[in-house]
């Protein structure tokens, strides 16, 4: 076990020796891209002294980068208006609900589960089995209206492919 670890250590030393002076094993192609970019724009931005090890990724360098020459007067002329948050009535915008974390707690899922339980308790597995049930549900074009409001309409696959294609 120990000899295999020594072999791996020797192998890793051998692999690091294969890199040239321009490359380090921890450098990525992004590092060279950023170095070239900052060298080209060094007359505009004072970036100070940096090496490839100090710029390991884009996020670390953003915090240390000095801003462009922007005076305080130009900054005070900016007109930033806050957008007013509109209150969204509960139950009207179903697509804005967070159902990824708790789908069973969603009002849509809960009401649909109750609808399914009521249908199976009364002997009907599918809404619209009988003519009585079809006449009890208000129809428009053969589909129940409340399903259209929820966006649960059946669409032929050919229409979807024609729409997307």
Curated annotation (Swiss-Prot):
The protein's job, in short, is: Involved in the regulation of plant growth.
Could you identify this protein by its name?
Vascular-related unknown protein 4
Question: What remark does the entry add?
Answer: Plants overexpressing VUP4 exhibit severe dwarfism.
Write out the GO biological process terms. multidimensional cell growth; xylem development
The record lists the organism as Arabidopsis thaliana
Chain ranges passing through the membrane: none
Q: PANTHER family attached here? A: VASCULAR-RELATED UNKNOWN PROTEIN 1-RELATED (PTHR33974), VASCULAR-RELATED UNKNOWN PROTEIN 4 (PTHR33974:SF26)
Reading the lineage from the top rank, the first entry is Eukaryota
């Amino acid at each position: 076990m120990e000899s295999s670890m020594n072999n791996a250590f020797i192998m890793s030393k051998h692999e690091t020796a294969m890199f040239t002076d321009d490359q380090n094993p921890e450098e990525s192609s992004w590092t060279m891209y950023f170095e070239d970019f900052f060298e080209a724009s060094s007359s505009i931005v004072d970036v100070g002294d940096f090496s490839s090890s100090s710029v390991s990724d884009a996020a670390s360098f953003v915090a240390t980068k000095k801003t462009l020459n922007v005076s305080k007067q130009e900054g005070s002329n900016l007109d930033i208006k806050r957008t007013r948050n509109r209150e969204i009535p509960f139950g009207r915008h179903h697509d804005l609900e967070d159902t990824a974390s708790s789908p069973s707690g969603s009002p849509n899922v809960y009401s649909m589960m109750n609808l399914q339980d009521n249908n199976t308790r009364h002997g009907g597995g599918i809404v619209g089995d009988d003519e009585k049930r079809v006449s009890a549900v208000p129809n428009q074009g053969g589909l129940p209206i409340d399903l259209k409001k929820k966006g649960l309409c059946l669409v032929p696959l050919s229409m979807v492919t024609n729409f997307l294609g």
